[in-house]
């Protein structure tokens, strides 16, 4: 049976609509607490489980934090509160403090009226599917509050930000610093606003922070990795060397160079792989997704690096990396994984890896990507009737086949259904924008006619 609440990145939705309601989140905390308390070795040791709760800057975070805390306490689980903290910061602190689990209250790059809950295991990794299934099973049981002498306690982790800042700095080579560099750092009015500027400043950079005035309602609003125009303008206006864009929970990274040019996760993955080759002699392989630009795949293979495409979602990139024992993977949206540095995607750490690569090479980003020109992509979202059988359409198959034949060796076609709405996403990639547009529109027209 499929999971009812957990998606690929925890539980997410609009605040006030099920399941992001205070009563459900309280029960979720209780259910998760009971699963933690019954973990192998926990009952035998008699030790009380302790979880860390962090959040981003959405106004609803206060309400959901209180609900989670109450649920965990009712299950007999102690709670440590980190306050506003990037998602990767919660993952790190959970592991570093030897806690039972970490919980993040965030909807990442979504607007303020959405929120979500995601969990990390004791080792700083996202929960396995079977543990999420156990939590869902407990949600169906009655909430039996622990006796007063068995209730969990809560306390604030006062030095959470400082601990995470030091961790981030430790991933930057000791032989380097950022003196003489002017950086614009866009924190998206999100979880990194008290952390990211300090990391780069303490490494010596002249930091110009933007997106650091959260009010509960402005997270990701015209700033951050989902709206990089603000950063591009700020870099040019301040004559900065580089701009760093994070999203609301700081697990994504986009970079802007001194000219205002934007670099996405695909391009940054190539830069990091090339840096590892220069440093270590070789990189066996890297992981992208179905959406990774074909030009990056071609360039990596030309460099002798195997390339594997995972399903869309950093969870699936991580699965492929672990399966193969590789270190580097990314999504074009800016989720970058470097498993020898962190167990999860970390925008700040990824930025430091890019800066270290530039320091080592003595090159600019444009120079490191010389010869790699991203293929134009055309994406068309076609709305269909719910349940429409697009896979059974001969007309759609013919349109796809015609495009693939025309683009053989110089482009690709990707058709996938949305998991949240009756929409078919048609993406065509080609060396020339006109070809991508032509074939995408032809396929989209076939879909519209076949599913009308």
From Swiss-Prot:
The modification Phosphoserine is found at residue 108. Mg(2+) binds at residues 108, 247, 249, 251. Coiled coil: none annotated. Its EC number is 5.4.2.10. Binds 1 Mg(2+) ion per subunit. The active site is at 108 (phosphoserine intermediate). PANTHER family: PHOSPHOGLUCOMUTASE (ALPHA-D-GLUCOSE-1,6-BISPHOSPHATE-DEPENDENT), PHOSPHOHEXOSE MUTASE. This is Phosphoglucosamine mutase.
